[in-house]
């Protein structure tokens, strides 16, 4: 998917890229590849692949479920790495207030420099483990929407993400092709953490065999105070 096809595909979903937005994606690609030479950000560096598997993949929830992204909503992206999915979403929807949580300082340094080059405001970068941030009263149950892409299996991911979503908010997981098995394993975790799966959608990225599953979870009740457990425990002992 080259930049032109990317723009054309978005326009079919009523997202017409402005020249500024087109340039932001071009700069994002150039900076990603440049910095990736000395900081491990991605295995994907071919332009067409970055536009498809990073940029387009990141914005698919916004294209398919625009109603989930309310005007001025507070979005938290857990383990965003090089900024996926939240920064491509933010480029399309500058009104969103975005917080990015990542445990690796080098990645956050990349994002900080990138945001300056892109001229993007309204993004808060938080250096820390999701388990610790989820117990911090500044962030706990403060977000309308929490996103995560390719971070951990669903039972673990739920404990990272649901404590950050406010009651009535949502948790959106961007998963691969075998999400059904993960969801089955995560039933107990979701129930304990106050989440309820409302929708899953399997999609294939355009012009490819890449299968993705979008999972939307409602935060129906408050997460008990003991969750998330201390750093490392959710991964070692999933709920």
Curated annotation (Swiss-Prot):
SUPFAM superfamilies: S-adenosyl-L-methionine-dependent methyltransferases
Enzyme class per UniProt: transferase
Keyword Ribonucleoprotein: no
Positions bound to S-adenosyl-L-methionine: 79, 84, 130-131, 149
Main location: cytoplasm
Keywords: Cytoplasm, Methyltransferase, rRNA processing, S-adenosyl-L-methionine, Transferase
Pfam entry (one): GidB
One term of GO molecular function: rRNA (guanine-N7-)-methyltransferase activity
GO cellular component: cytosol
CDD domains hit by this protein: AdoMet_MTases
Enzyme Commission (EC) number: 2.1.1.-
The protein, known as: Ribosomal RNA small subunit methyltransferase G
């Amino acid at each position: 998917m080259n930049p032109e096809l990317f723009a054309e595909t978005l326009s079919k979903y009523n997202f017409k890229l402005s020249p500024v937005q087109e340039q932001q994606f071009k700069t994002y690609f150039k900076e990603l590849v440049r910095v990736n030479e000395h900081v491990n950000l991605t295995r994907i560096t071919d332009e067409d692949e970055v536009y498809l598997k990073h940029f387009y993949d990141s914005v698919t929830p916004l294209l398919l479920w625009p109603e989930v992204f309310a005007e001025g909503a507070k979005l938290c992206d857990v383990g965003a790495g090089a900024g996926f999915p939240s920064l491509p979403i933010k480029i399309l929807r500058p009104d969103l207030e975005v917080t990015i949580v990542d445990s690796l300082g080098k990645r956050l340094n990349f994002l900080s420099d990138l945001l300056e080059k892109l001229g993007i405001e309204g993004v808060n970068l938080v250096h820390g483990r999701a388990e610790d941030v989820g117990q911090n009263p500044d962030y706990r149950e403060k977000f309308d929407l929490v996103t995560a892409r390719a971070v951990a299996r669903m039972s673990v991911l739920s404990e990272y993400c649901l404590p950050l979503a406010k009651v009535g908010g949502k948790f959106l997981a961007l998963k691969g092709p075998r999400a059904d098995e993960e969801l089955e394993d995560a039933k107990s975790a979701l129930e304990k953490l106050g989440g309820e799966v409302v929708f899953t959608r399997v999609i294939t990225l355009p012009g490819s065999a890449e299968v993705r599953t979008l999972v939307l979870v409602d935060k129906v009740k408050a997460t008990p105070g003991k969750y998330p457990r201390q750093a490392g425990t959710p991964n070692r002992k999933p709920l």
